[in-house]
Structures are given as structure tokens and as C-alpha cells.
Amino acid sequence: VWVTAVALIVTVASTRAEEPTRVSLSGEVRGASGAHTVRVALWSEAGFLEKPVEEVDFDAGRATRYTFLVPRGRWAISAYEDRNENGILDMGLFGPREPNGFWRQFRGRHKPHFDEVAMPVDHDIADANIVLR
């Protein structure tokens, strides 16, 4: 019995040691006009909507497929089309003035909370697509 228990513990420990420490999180941005820069940002809860963990810009007319390598956990991804090329998502009285979206769809008029747009990531994900609206 002891030998079996020790073998089981060693097997579980070695399996966990072989798991990758980072996973691939990728997708594409849809709904962009193709005439302006598209900015994609990866967010953790700690710096949500203040300081992205990573950002990727796509020039006008370029493919908008992105990939982030992240530790397992909860992540949010946002994107917007920078129509006036000023480097920020312009806000109006009733919300954003430029097409934008999140990986986890959000339709509120208020500034989203991390929990409203974050998704759990514990394995490679290839279809973290964002639709700009």
C-alpha cells in the first residue's frame, strides 16, 4: 500500500512539473474598418484599465491576429480602433466614441469591472476573438 501511495504521489508531482508555466492566449479582432490602427491590450486585475500587462498595435489594413503568453489565471483582453490616431480610446458622455470590445463580450454603458470582462485561462486558447462595436 505504501509503495502504491508513494508511486501515485511521484506521478502526480512529475505530471505537474511537466505542465507549462505559461499558456498561449490568441485570437483576432473583427469588425475593424481597416482604415485605422487597432490596439489590443492584455489586462490583469491589478492594473485593469490603468496599466495593461502588454499591448499590441496593428497598423491600418493589417491582419489583427494576436497572441499573448500568460501564466494560468484570470485575464481580460480589450481592443479598439483608434479612428483619430491619438493613442487613446476616446470617451463621450454615453461611453466610448470609437469602436471597441472585450474578449468576454460587455455591453454596459459604464466602465466595466474586471470580473465583468475577465475569463479564466488554464490551457492554450486559440479563439479569444474580439468583435468591435
What are these regions (language model features)?
Residues R83-M91:
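Acidic, glycine-anchored loop motifs typical of Ca2+
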Residues V23-G31, I130:
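A short, amphipathic beta-strand motif
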Residues A32-F48:
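Short, ordered, surface-exposed loop/turn motifs in non-cytosolic proteins
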Residues R62-T64, P71-R74:
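A glycine-anchored, Pro-Gly-centered beta-turn/N-cap motif
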Residues W2-T11:
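Bacterial N-terminal signal peptides
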Residues G73-R83:
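A short, solvent-exposed beta-strand micro-motif common in secreted/extracellular proteins
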Residues E98-R133:
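Extracellular beta-sheet/turn segments enriched in Thr/Pro/Gly and aliphatic residues
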Residues F48-R62:
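Short, acidic Ser/Thr/Gly-rich low-complexity loop/linker segments typical of extracellular
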